[in-house]
Amino acid sequence: MLTLPPENRWLFREPFGTVFSDFSMVLPYIEGKIFCTVGDVVTHNALSAGLIPSIGVIDGFTKRSPYLKMPEIQGHILHVTNPAGTITDELIAALRLAMDEIPCVVMVNGEEDLAVLPLTEILPDGAVILYGQPEEGLVICEVNKQLRANAKKLLTYFVSL
């Protein structure tokens, strides 16, 4: 299990990709691509727009409050435990399995926010990751060599337990 020490959490306040203020603005970027969502609101917005993420990673909360708007989930559902501020081996294994079970929702008991990092390694080049940036909008990241390098660098700030 990787744990992000509290003193390094500031590194994750900046978006990991391009920020859009409205979900409709990202539609041209995900058309015809494998795309994954991390977070309840962004997953809800994708499903409400009639789009089914290849992998949706949710925890039932938004801004630490229960999120009750989720439309009916389609596809396989995997349940994992991933405490806040961590990336567990269980989460990574579920994300890998989810690639073989598309469409799939990974329901996290704990927190899903950091799932973006392992997804950069698991997804193929050209896939897109969408996640919410509180008070800013929606972040879109296209998986490529540079994104993987950025994720790998951020992972150096974690400690292994």
Swiss-Prot record:
Binding site for GTP: 40-42, 59, 112, 135
Reactions it catalyzes: 3'-dephospho-CoA + GTP = GDP + CoA + H(+)
Pathway, per record: Cofactor biosynthesis; coenzyme A biosynthesis
Pfam families: DUF359
GO annotation terms (biological process): coenzyme A biosynthetic process
Keyword Transferase: yes
GO molecular function, one term: kinase activity
Top-level taxon: Archaea
Entry EC no(s): 2.7.1.237
InterPro entries tied to this protein: GTP-dep_dephospho-CoA_kin (IPR007164)
Database matches in HAMAP family: Dephospho_CoA_kinase_GTP_dep
Role, per record: Catalyzes the GTP-dependent phosphorylation of the 3'-hydroxyl group of dephosphocoenzyme A to form coenzyme A (CoA).
UniProt family annotation: Belongs to the GTP-dependent DPCK family.
Official protein name in the record: GTP-dependent dephospho-CoA kinase
Species, as recorded: Methanocorpusculum labreanum (strain ATCC 43576 / DSM 4855 / Z)
Origin organism lineage: Archaea, Methanobacteriati, Methanobacteriota, Stenosarchaea group, Methanomicrobia
